Each structure stands twice: as structure tokens, then as C-alpha cells.
Amino acid sequence: MANEKFGKGIFMKMLLGIYKKPLQVERIFMFLDLKSSTTIAENLGNYKYSQFIQDAFIELNEVVSKHSASIYQYVGDEAVLVWTFKSGLLYDNCIKVFFKFIEQLSGKKDYFQEKYGFHPEFKASVHGGKVIFAEIGTIKKELAYHGDVINTTARIQSLCNQYQQQLLVSETIWNVINSKKQYDSQVYLDAYLKGKNETLTLFGVQKIGDLVS
């Protein structure tokens, strides 16, 4: 379980107590959030909505390991993926995983529509930088990331609707993506993030030929 969540070798290091002392690491995060979640939940009710989310995240699991990602958290109808910088930038995994997930869901559109009357669509943000990685808790131990990078990634995702973009990527990450020619991108200068004093430059990213939803 720990290997799936944080990467290979983490569980053994946890047993050895290595993470009891906080470590500074560099990570890339993706925050994935279900579009129109309130409307879907109100129509389906709690039980069927939970099944809907389960089915959607089964499709996510189909693509995560193929793109060297770990699922850090599920929070309601949101999932948080994490990579080391090396694994996230290799083959542009931190970008490609989103579009593969969308393709996976598209292939199951009829299934979702027939079973639930809705098909899941997601929006996402990608950002990265230095965070603290540490073991927390005593009765229930957990490994957790802390730092402004995580908060910033969440704030970026909250702008997807405003900019009418499925995927927003920070300048920090977009500048080091190798295969930019595979994508269409739109730059947003001086993007204001709630609770932040400084603005950021963001990029709305689509596969070439895709229309902004």
C-alpha cells in the first residue's frame, strides 16, 4: 500500500524510522477534480454517487502506474497524484497521464451514461517544487507531504473553470516539459491565486486538435 502511494522502497524506510525526521524533497503534484460534482451528486444520491466515483477512479488506476505516478490521496471526488521530478518529467508523464485518463473515461462513456445517466469529466492542475515529507501520528501513522507547493497546486486547479481549461500547468513545470510540440497551450499571465500575494504564469494545455471545453 505504501509503495503504491509513495513509490517503491518507501514502506521499508518507514519501518526503519527514516521519515520520523522530516525530509525536504522535490515533487510534482496533480490535483484532479470531478466537474459538475454537485449536480451529479444531487441527481444520483449519496450511494449511487459513491459508486460513480469508485468507477471513475478505477479508470484512473488503469493509467496511473503506466505513467510512474503514485496516488497520494483521494478526497471526496478529488484525487491527488505525485511524482518525483525525474519520473514526472520522463516522457512528460505528469502531462500525459491526464489525457490518457480522459481517453480511458471516453472509452467508457456509454457505460457511465447507461448506468448513471452521467459520464465523468475531470479538470486538473500540475505544479511542483520543494515540499517536506514526514511520518506523522502515533496511534495511526501516516506519511504526508507539507508545503506551499501543495496549496498552490490546489489553488491553480480552482482556476480551471475561470479560464475554461481542463488542464492548467504552472510555468515551473511547463518550462521543463520536453515535448511541448505535442500540445496546444494558452498562456495566462499574472494569474491571481486566492490567498496568495504573488501572481503566477499558468498554461492551459490541450492535446493538439482538442477544443477547450
Name the predicted role of every residue range:
Residues 1-25:
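Regulatory cytosolic signal-relay segments
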Residues 22-93:
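Catalytic NTP-binding/metal-coordinating core of nucleotidyl cyclase/transferase enzymes
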Residues 35, 130-131, 172:
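Alpha-helix/helix-capping structural signal
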Residues 49, 94-105:
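DHp/HisKA dimerization helices and adjoining segments of the cytosolic kinase module
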Residues 67-93, 109-148:
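Catalytic core of nucleotidyl cyclases, primarily class III adenylyl/guanylyl cyclases
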Residues 104, 108, 156-163, 180:
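Conserved, well-folded catalytic cores of nucleic-acid-processing
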Residues 127, 148-172:
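Catalytic/regulatory signature loops of cyclic-dinucleotide turnover enzymes
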Residues 162-213:
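Intrinsically disordered, glycine/charged-rich C-terminal tails and inter-domain linkers
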